[in-house]
Amino acid sequence: MPPKLPDFANISERLRKALRLEHRIVVIGLSDTPPANLPHYEGEPLKACQMLDTVRFEGKSFYTVQNDHYECKNAIRWLGFDESYEGHFSGEWATGDYPDNGRALFRAPAFSRRMYEESPKVRVGTVKCAYYMPLEKANEGPARGDEVAIFVLNPRQAMYLARGTLYSRGGICYGMTGPGTCQSVIAGPFCTRQPMYSLGCFGARQFMKITGNE
């Protein structure tokens, strides 16, 4: 018999009340097979981080495949769908001239390479679909252990969440800011199985509906 799952709707309600969250907590799973009980995403082309907003604000559940993620060539690699584009891991793109020849995020390619070498990465080819759902509906999903929960918080809420995770295990909290948000808050905890805190990235703050204090 499969193990009995927690009551995710109750957990979501308690977390949102304790943290005073206005919007939903998002669950995203990285899997090799599409879940049979979720619909395929059929909306307008979005980046992986923008899809988080679809869940946060609209409460939708869906799965995506590789072809749904070409709006962001960074997420294609970080989520384990496909190989990187030319100039990505070499650091040339991250130091090139904006907008057509790069993003000028680093002064030298070596600095970009250091970031990527130190960042968690999902192995390419191991992911065939990414599925999204609100935490309160997670009992309707496959719950195969390949999911992570994503909270969009202000500093005070983040502090309380961090202290709460340490209450029953001790230690310290780790964060990662530098890579894309999809790598920091999706690939990071997926690979390490540890909570990961991030200030986000330029792309997420441009394309997601994140306020200045989140």
Question: Which functions belong to the PLM regions below?
Answer:
Residues P3-E214:
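Acidic, serine/proline-rich low-complexity intrinsically disordered regions
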